[in-house]
């Protein structure tokens, strides 16, 4: 799995888990809804760490919690 796919899937999972809409996350994180949608729909394949931190803050989790999943632990190497 590619890193951007893992980020997208994790974000979708957290939105469902926290029962948040894109609009709610945008308000809580101060990240524009268009930016969140670009990540979710694959237009943005390299969201910045600051953006991810803001999204995590909006969901009430840490960056460590965001990345601490089996999916991220087993990501394939991007550069071969």
What are these regions (language model features)?
Residues 1-20:
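A short, Lys/Arg-rich alpha-helix, primarily the initiator
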Residues 12, 23, 53:
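Residues within the helices of the helix-turn-helix
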Residues 13, 38, 64-80:
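Short, charged recognition helix plus adjacent turn
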Residues 15, 26, 56:
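The alpha-helix within a helix-turn-helix
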Residues 19-38:
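Short alpha-helical DNA-recognition segment
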Residues 32, 43, 70-74:
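The DNA-recognition helices of helix-turn-helix-type DNA-binding domains
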Residues 43-57:
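Short, basic-rich loop-to-helix N-cap that marks the start of a DNA-contacting helix
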């Amino acid at each position: 799995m590619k890193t951007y796919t893992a980020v997208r899937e994790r974000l979708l999972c957290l939105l469902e888990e926290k029962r948040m809409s894109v609009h709610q996350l945008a308000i809580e994180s101060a990240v524009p809804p268009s930016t969140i949608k670009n990540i979710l729909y694959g237009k943005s394949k390299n969201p910045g760490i600051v953006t991810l931190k803001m999204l995590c803050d909006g969901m009430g989790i840490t960056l460590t919690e965001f990345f601490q999943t089996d999916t991220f632990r087993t990501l394939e190497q991007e550069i071969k």
